Regions:
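Short, solvent-exposed loop/turn segments that connect beta-strands within catalytic domains
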Residues: 39-43, 100-103
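Short, acidic/hydrophobic/Gly-rich beta-strand patch recurrent on exposed beta strands
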Residues: 45-49
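A short gly/proline-enriched turn/hairpin at secondary-structure junctions
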Residues: 56-59
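A small-molecule sensor/coupling module
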Residues: 150-157
């Protein structure tokens, strides 16, 4: 992650003289995808974690030397157990979050992907389950609105191709 200079980097102990130090800010990038298949309609692979009730799209951070596309394919394959290939780029979600005193400015690159093999029972342990859901059900189930927006865009792209 690339570090953005903060007040502590410049020797100042507070932001704007308010007496409170500014949190460190770091940039973060990840990549993943909306994996689809055509069954009796469009189905989307989503990942669930029972410990916190989160349902999301598969994604993760780049390994050294990886392109964003390589990261997306690797992370989606690991988290879903599926072999996938990229069809098209859907878009980028940008957001901020804080963890352990650090503010992160994150960009998540999402790709439309189709499955070429594999089995969801072979997913890694980041999520408890991976399920194929009809697109409408996936939209209702996903925890984060920004991921549902990516699924909406993916559906439009799939419908334009079929």
């Amino acid at each position: 992650m690339k570090k953005t200079p903060s007040a502590s980097d410049s020797g100042s102990s507070s932001a704007g003289g308010g007496g409170r130090p500014r949190p460190r800010v770091e940039d973060a990038v990840s990549a993943g995808g909306v994996v689809y298949r055509l069954n009796e309609g469009i189905e989307i692979a989503i990942c669930g974690r029972t410990s916190d009730g989160v349902w999301g799209l598969p994604k993760g951070t780049p390994d050294p030397g990886e392109t964003i596309e390589q990261t997306a394919v690797r992370e989606v394959s690991e988290e879903t157990g599926l072999q996938v290939e990229i069809v098209a780029k859907i878009g980028v979600v940008e957001y901020w979050f804080a963890r352990e005193g650090v503010r992160y400015h994150k960009w998540v690159h999402h790709f439309l992907m189709q499955t070429t093999g594999g089995d969801t029972s072979q997913h890694d342990l980041e999520y408890d389950k991976v399920e194929w859901r009809p697109v409408e059900d996936a939209l209702r189930t996903l925890t984060f609105r920004n991921e549902a927006n990516m699924v909406e865009k993916a559906r439009e792209m799939i419908e334009a191709m079929t």
